[in-house]
């Protein structure tokens, strides 16, 4: 479902007519070699497209107009090969709507000590050309990613590739829809939010459909489609054979087919359900939701559209990378002194992309929702570095809270726990990380990912100009409290 190859990134090189046609030709040739080399590196998720060298204000404005109008263009990379006076860039930058990366590099890695002359100096001016360009970005208060270093360096390429994945997630969020089946869980605060502001700031279009419409589609699913899907279940998962379980699994298969059809029809990228509004659905969607998350859809339980959108964004960022991303909830604690851990799970809806083993389909009673026993995938989660991220509405802004965690082995079996689960240690440690999370107002619902790291989320927040707070091994609680106070002032004063 997620194809980052559909996007492209425009590579804009700045110069001016001052240096003459011969120098401009060399600028174009060297830029072409850089872009060709980058496109030959599989680390980049999308194609980088070189545009003609930009030499005056009219050309610059025109290229940004075209970038804005091109849905395939997910972002713009700028580099000043020579000195390119930045007043020329104001009209173009002022209309830019795409994520922006400022690459501060140079074609040659080393100074040619024995042959360097003024022709070389006039050609290779990014050392001061990019400083001029950096000033106009700062003066215009533009959100941008700055990457510094030689274009052949692995670290430089990794940072560009991460940013490209983030930009793809932003473009995806601006063109798709989040479908809500029913409303938020009654009386819950953190899952609420301003859907109008979400579309303005994040690009997410969030709309609600009645569960009854979905229920009618479930009833109309052809039996032959159900049989085909059951064959796939048997191939991919450990599946029970008893009649009680198979009946429940068939109902989830029907819901999966109906949900997928509905989501495709609405051009949806994510969706929510709530156990308080199931209408004529036979079960709370469990296996069906897990399967759709596995395809790449974002999901949020209990109407949590912010979690659904964030899960989708991380899935786009991590598409094709090792690991996975899931809707998650901090469920219960293991509080042995010195080894405090969090058990993350949800009633049914944990994505199998984070499974460390072949998932099992199980059917068990569910005490809420008032429906038949639902089928779900059960598994232990992957081990290793991960992130937990939550987006909350603070009234005058969105706040992204991110915690680096270490997922650890589940050393004891839990034979009576009928849900997928993952066990992690928050960094820097349980007490400080949890204190900071609670002080920041982070939700109990999160996007949990073993595919992306904190840098992706920082790039995402900065590109969208929303507040972010990072809780990691460098946390100082007193400074964190100060950051919360400073942010209140900053975001209160900021008017854009």
Swiss-Prot record:
Cystines in this chain: none
Record's cofactor remark: Binds 1 Mn(2+) ion per subunit.
GO MF annotation, one: L-arabinose isomerase activity
Source domain of life: Bacteria
Bilayer-crossing regions: none
Necessary cofactors: Mn(2+)
Keywords: Arabinose catabolism, Carbohydrate metabolism, Isomerase, Manganese, Metal-binding
Pathway noted in the entry: Carbohydrate degradation; L-arabinose degradation via L-ribulose; D-xylulose 5-phosphate from L-arabinose (bacterial route): step 1/3
E.C. no: 5.3.1.4
Gene3D superfamilies: 3.40.50.10940
Coiled-coil region: none
GO cellular component: cytosol
Top enzyme class: isomerase
Reactions catalysed: beta-L-arabinopyranose = L-ribulose
Record GO biological process: L-arabinose catabolic process to xylulose 5-phosphate
PANTHER family, alphabetized: L-ARABINOSE ISOMERASE
Entry similarity comment: Belongs to the arabinose isomerase family.
Function: Catalyzes the conversion of L-arabinose to L-ribulose.
HAMAP family registered for this protein in UniProt: Arabinose_Isome
Protein name: L-arabinose isomerase
Record organism: Thermotoga neapolitana (strain ATCC 49049 / DSM 4359 / NBRC 107923 / NS-E)
């Amino acid at each position: 479902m997620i194809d980052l190859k559909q996007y492209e990134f425009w590579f804009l090189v700045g110069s001016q007519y001052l240096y003459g046609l011969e120098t401009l030709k060399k600028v174009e040739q060297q830029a072409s070699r850089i872009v060709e080399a980058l496109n030959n590196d599989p680390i980049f998720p999308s194609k980088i497209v070189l545009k003609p060298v930009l030499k005056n204000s009219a050309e610059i404005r025109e290229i940004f107009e075209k970038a804005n109008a091109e849905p395939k263009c997910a972002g713009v990379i700028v580099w000043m090969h020579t000195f390119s006076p930045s007043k020329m860039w104001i009209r173009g930058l002022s209309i830019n709507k795409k994520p922006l990366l400022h690459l501060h590099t140079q074609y040659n890695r080393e100074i040619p000590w024995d042959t360097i002359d003024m022709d070389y100096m006039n050609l290779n001016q990014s050392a001061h050309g990019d400083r001029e360009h950096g000033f106009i970005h700062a003066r215009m208060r533009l959100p941008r990613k700055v990457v510094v270093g030689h274009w052949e360096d692995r670290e430089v390429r990794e940072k560009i590739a991460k940013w490209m994945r983030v930009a793809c997630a932003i473009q995806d969020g601006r063109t798709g829809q989040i479908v809500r089946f029913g409303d938020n869980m009654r009386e819950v605060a953190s899952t609420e939010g301003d859907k109008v502001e979400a579309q303005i700031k994040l690009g997410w279009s969030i709309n609600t459909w009645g569960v009854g419409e979905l229920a009618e589609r479930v009833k109309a699913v052809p039996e032959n489609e159900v049989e085909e899907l059951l064959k796939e279940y048997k191939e991919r998962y450990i599946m029970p054979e008893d009649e009680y379980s198979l009946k429940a699994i068939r109902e989830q298969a029907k819901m999966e087919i109906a949900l997928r059809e509905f989501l495709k029809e609405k051009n949806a990228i994510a969706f929510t359900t709530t156990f308080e509004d199931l209408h004529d659905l036979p079960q709370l969607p469990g296996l069906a939701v897990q399967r759709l998350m596995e395809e790449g859809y974002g999901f949020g339980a209990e109407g949590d559209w912010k979690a659904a959108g964030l899960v989708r964004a991380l899935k786009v960022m991590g598409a094709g990378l090792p690991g996975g991303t899931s809707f998650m909830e901090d469920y219960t604690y293991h509080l042995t002194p010195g080894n405090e851990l969090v058990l993350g799970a949800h009633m049914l809806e944990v994505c199998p992309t984070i499974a460390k083993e072949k998932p099992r389909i199980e059917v068990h009673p569910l005490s809420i929702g008032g429906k038949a026993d639902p089928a779900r995938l059960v598994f232990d989660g992957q081990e290793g570095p991960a992130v937990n991220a939550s987006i909350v509405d603070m009234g005058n802004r969105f706040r992204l809270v991110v915690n680096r965690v270490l997922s650890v082995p589940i050393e004891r079996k839990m034979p009576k726990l009928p849900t997928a689960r993952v066990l992690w240690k928050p960094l820097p440690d349980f007490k400080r990380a949890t204190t900071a999370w609670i002080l920041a107002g982070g939700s109990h619902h999160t996007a949990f990912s073993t595919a992306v790291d904190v840098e992706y989320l920082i790039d995402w927040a900065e590109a969208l100009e929303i507040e972010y707070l990072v809780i990691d091994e460098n946390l100082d609680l007193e400074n964190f409290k100060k950051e919360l106070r400073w942010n209140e002032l900053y975001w209160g004063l900021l008017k854009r």
